[in-house]
Design a protein with these regions (language model features):
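Long, charge-patterned amphipathic alpha-helical coiled-coil/hairpin "stalk" segments used as oligomerization
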Residues: 82-163
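Interdomain regulatory linker/hinge segments that flank or connect interaction modules
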Residues: 8-16
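Short loop/helix-cap segments at secondary-structure boundaries that form the rim of catalytic
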Residues: 69-75, 95
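Active-site regions of enzymes building and remodeling cell-envelope glycoconjugates
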Residues: 75-81
Length: 163
């Protein structure tokens, strides 16, 4: 299918649908053919920026040390300082992961982030990802990153050829 056919199909679906009393959303399902997902190099992990924001506000948590604490307090929904990592147990990390959509981490403390949060965030696919721009230097400005994460969506194939 080309872009015009896809846009036309979406327009028809929206026009023919009956009026709802809630905010509707569209789900896009893509079937991929000719991929062997048992091979690591054929798996897909991409972060795609959308032209408009998603329906809800994306919650961002910063995992930082003292260098970014003022910027994180101003721009992110929550933050965890390097000094507080030792106080966090597995239960607290799970609660934090439930209420967070993206984690942003400072690059120079990534080994400590992986050591503390890796067992909980790793299997959930929530570790700070450099592909999404979630691993930042100690001098980074978090405001444009948080704004970009509001429009970002993650696409991943695990064991099925459907996205």
């Amino acid at each position: 299918m080309n872009n015009k056919e896809i846009i036309q199909a979406i327009k028809e679906a929206r026009e023919n649908a009956k009026e709802r009393k809630f905010t509707e959303s569209l789900d896009l399902v893509i079937n991929l053919k000719g991929l062997n997902l048992k091979k690591e190099d054929e798996k897909i992990l991409a972060f795609i920026p959308l032209p408009h924001q998603r329906g809800k506000k994306v919650k961002v948590t910063a995992l930082i040390d003292q260098a970014l604490v003022t910027k994180a307090k101003a721009d992110c929904d929550e933050h965890a300082l390097l000094e507080d990592f030792k106080k966090l147990d597995k239960k607290a990390i799970k609660k934090l992961a439930k209420r967070t959509d993206y984690f942003v981490a400072q690059a120079n403390i990534m080994p400590k982030v992986a050591q503390t949060f890796g067992r909980v965030l790793g299997p959930r696919g929530m570790m700070p990802n450099p592909k999404a721009g979630c691993v930042v230097p100690p001098t980074a400005d978090l405001k444009p990153l948080v704004a970009r994460l509001q429009n970002l969506v993650r696409i991943e194939t695990k064991n099925e050829q459907t996205i």
